[in-house]
Amino acid sequence: MMVGPVKIRVEGVSKVFGREPKAALAKVRGGMDKAQLLEETGHVLGLYDITLDIRAGEIFVIMGLSGCGKSTLIRHFNRLIEPTDGRILFDGEDILTYDTARLQAFRRRKVAMVFQRFALLPHKTVIENVAYGLTLDGVERASAKARAADQIALVGLAGFEDSYPAQLSGGMQQRVGLARALATDADVLLMDEAFSALDPLIRHDMQLQLKDLQGRLGKTIVFITHDLDEALLLGDHIAILKDGTLRQSGTGADILAHPADEYVARFVRDVNRGRILLCGAFAEAGLVPAADAPVIPAETTLEAAFAIFAGGAPAVAIRGRDGTITGGLTPRRVMEALARE
C-alpha cells in the first residue's frame, strides 16, 4: 500500500440532532452523557469531538455497532449532514466554507458515494446508470458512455451494458453502483455498508475485488461496516466508534495488539489474531538469527510464520519494506503474541 498526505482531516467534529444543538452540545461538554441528553432535552448526540486523519490512497474503515455514529460521520464528508461544531478539511480546504455552487462541484467531482441498497435507476440500463452522473455534469453523451463502458469492464460486467437492474443479481447490481462511482473519477469513494445486503460468498468476492481495484487505481476509500472481519480484511486503518465517540484508531494489527480500552478489547477478543497480526510488529531488534535462517517479509502474518517454525527453524530474520533486516523472531515470541489477551 502506498499512501500519501492527509486527504481528509476531521477536527473536533460533533453533531447533535434537535432544535437547539449548540445549547445541547454545551451540556455534553459540561458532563451530560448521551442518555441523559436525550431524556432531559430530547436531543440526540450523534457524534462527539471526533478527530482523525484519512490519508490519500488508503482504505480507511469506520466501524462500530448500530447507532454508534459511523453513517452520520461519513455523511459529513460530503456535507449531506452539517456538523454542530468542528472542521472537515479536504486537501487542506475547509469544505464547510463552500457556497452552494462550490459544494455542488465538490460532490460531483471530488467525492462519490456507494450505498448499501445500490440506488440504481430501475428504468435505465447498466450503461445509462453508470453514465448518469457524467451526463448530469455536462459530459457529452458519447464520451460519457465510453467512460462508463470502461468502468463496467473494470468491475467485471462487460456484456451487461444493456441489461436492466432487475435482470442482475445483488452482487452485480452493487458492481454497477461501484462502476458509477468510479466513472466520475472522484478522488474519494464513500462506501456506507456497501456490501452488507449481499450474501456471504458474494460479499467476500466484492471485498476482494474492492481491494484489487484500490490497489490498481489508488483511490482513497472510506468504508463503513459493523463487521469486524470485514474491517480487518479491507482496512489499512480502522476507527472504532461507540455512542458517537472515537474509541480507537489505528491499523488492524495495532488495535488487536494494543486495544485502547475494555470495549475495544471485547470487540476484538474472538478474532483469529494469527491471520491479522504481522511479524514486523513483534521483531526483536537485538536478535540476530543465524546466517542460514529463513528471511521473511515484515508483512508476513504470525500464522504463516508459525508454519515456518513447525519445520524446525529456531528463528527467522525479518526483512523490512526497504529490504534491510529489522530484527529476528522466535517461536516463543509468536506464541506470546498469539496468547496475549
Specify the residue positions occupied by each region the protein language model found.
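Conserved ABC ATPase "signature" region
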Residues: 13, 27-36, 91-94, 135, ...
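Short coil-to-helix segment of the ABC ATPase nucleotide-binding domain corresponding to the Q-loop/switch region
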Residues: 124-131
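Conserved ABC ATPase signature
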Residues: 164-168, 172
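A short, proline-enriched helix->beta-strand linker immediately N-terminal to the Walker B motif
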Residues: 183-187
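Conserved ABC ATPase "signature" C-loop
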Residues: 243-244
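ABC ATPase "signature
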Residues: 249-250, 258, 328
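The conserved cystathionine-beta-synthase
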Residues: 291-314, 318-322, 329-341
